[in-house]
Amino acid sequence: MSPLWLLLGLLALTGSSESSSWGCYGNIRTLDTPGASCRIGRRYGLTYCGVRASERLAEVDRPYLLRHQPTMRLVGQKYCMDPAVIAGVLSRESPGGNYVVDLGNIGSGLGMVKETKFYPPTAWKSETWVSQKTQTLTSSIKEIKTRFPTWTADQHLRGGLCAYSKGPNFVRSNQDLNCDFCNDVLARAKYFKDHGF
């Protein structure tokens, strides 16, 4: 066997193992999720909901997100966050990849509601912007981890996603880990994980 083929084989093996073990906040491959609610599916013109809807919406965003995958990988390494989860969050927050929605402080729980703003997709090109989103998510996960130290890493991830979306006081028990944002993001993240993220 030629050394070149051996080297290429080793690179392929290390690349696949790297992408399957990303992140300090749970294993998205093992998480079960119902996916997007029917409300989310209808919002985007789908006649179905659940994992199928989340996967379809992720599929629509995938070509755009692929262009920014190096940024997500870099930020993922910096914050020990699976790039597939970052892609899932960005996909959920950017309908069809056409624009990014900023709903102000709705998720912060501070009671301040700002005017809805739409940013062009070029905002995603910024490593700083992706870092800010990821830092906010990891801070939410760490806060949940501090409040509920006996929970599993998967529960911390779910709680962090719900807190990221609904504010830190939304999660009061493990009954609050089934929010629509979390379910949809995890289904999209699993799709992205299976498609190279």
Swiss-Prot record:
Location of this chain's protein in the cell: Secreted
Keywords on record: Disulfide bond, Glycosidase, Hydrolase, Secreted, Signal
Annotated signal peptide: 1-19
Single GO cellular component term: extracellular region
Protein's UniProt keywords contain Hydrolase: yes
GO biological process, one term: peptidoglycan catabolic process
Gene3D superfamilies registered for this protein in UniProt: 1.10.530.10
Record keyword Transcription regulation present: no
Residue positions of the active site: 93
Enzyme Commission numbers on file: 3.2.1.-
InterPro entries assigned to the protein according to its UniProt record, in alphabetical order: Glyco_hydro_23, Lysozyme-like_dom_sf
Molecular functions per Gene Ontology: lysozyme activity
Disulfide bonding pattern of the chain: 24-80, 38-49
Enzyme class, first EC level, given as a word: hydrolase
The family this protein is said to belong to: Belongs to the glycosyl hydrolase 23 family.
Protein name, as recorded: Lysozyme g-like protein 1
Organism: Mus musculus (Mouse)
